[in-house]
């Protein structure tokens, strides 16, 4: 049963060296302990907080890692187990530990979509900027549609327009995977609506998915319908000519209205993650809602 104490029959409590099937390459009582897999990892990945407490009290290293540099904190975050994350951080777990695949605990929390774990890690100093472009937390959260995680990363200074060569921007990934909530959050927070992947814009990505809703959203935020990708094609040229999306593109191909231009300019003046200040402007409520895309 989870939480069972070793040594209840009077014997010595089970410790790290009582598991001969685990290959330990250094002293497991030290913070740089290495193993193929340990009971600490097992407890963390399954969210067994009582077992985790017992193992720590028996001398197991909080920062024990596998040959691929995976720590118990990585596993707890991947499983979205907030209670285990709290225990590990309380006992000194390395919040910015990096695996052989460049995954950090924060990246794993974004994979699982655990907003609570993301916030706790950020409060304990987790870096929002990735150690490598192979594992970017904000890109992973946007791709999977974890909008609350995206919001927290932005609030802690995450680069909303970080462009990775093989992925593009967070906005591009959200569009490519049709994650509407994340697309809206990124746009509302000031993401560049025309920055995508290479010469592909987010609107090109949306054209391929044939999403009218996302196309409208991007164009409302100023997406360039005339932008050409590496093949010299505009978004409208990526959809069937008679499709509803093609008709929508044709309707929006003309120059934007003065009202739309004013909205885009005012929002740009406020900058990233500052649009909430629009509510403080001395303007009619209807106009504020227009500026906020409400």
Curated annotation (Swiss-Prot):
CDD domains: SOCS_ASB_9_11. It comes from the Eukaryota. One of its GO terms (biological process) is intracellular signal transduction. The modification N-acetylmethionine is found at residue 1. The keyword Phosphoprotein applies. Keywords: Acetylation, ANK repeat, Mitochondrion, Phosphoprotein, Repeat, Ubl conjugation pathway. The modification Phosphoserine is found at residue 51. Residues 240-294 form the SOCS box domain. Predominantly expressed in testis, kidney, and liver. InterPro entries: Ankyrin-SOCS_box_domain, Ankyrin_rpt, Ankyrin_rpt-contain_sf, ASB9/11_SOCS, SOCS_box, SOCS_box-like_dom_sf. The record marks 103, 107 as: Essential for binding to CKB. It is found in: Mitochondrion. One of its GO terms (molecular function) is ubiquitin-like ligase-substrate adaptor activity. GO terms for cellular component: Cul5-RING ubiquitin ligase complex; cytosol; mitochondrion. ANK repeats lie at residues 35-64, 68-97, 101-130, 133-162, 166-195, 198-227. Pathway: Protein modification; protein ubiquitination. Belongs to the ankyrin SOCS box (ASB) family. Substrate-recognition component of the ECS(ASB9) complex, composed of ASB9, CUL5, ELOB, ELOC and RNF7/RBX2. Substrate-recognition component of a cullin-5-RING E3 ubiquitin-protein ligase complex (ECS complex, also named CRL5 complex), which mediates the ubiquitination and subsequent proteasomal degradation of target proteins. The ECS(ASB9) complex catalyzes ubiquitination of creatine kinases CKB and CKMT1A. This is Ankyrin repeat and SOCS box protein 9. The gene is ASB9.
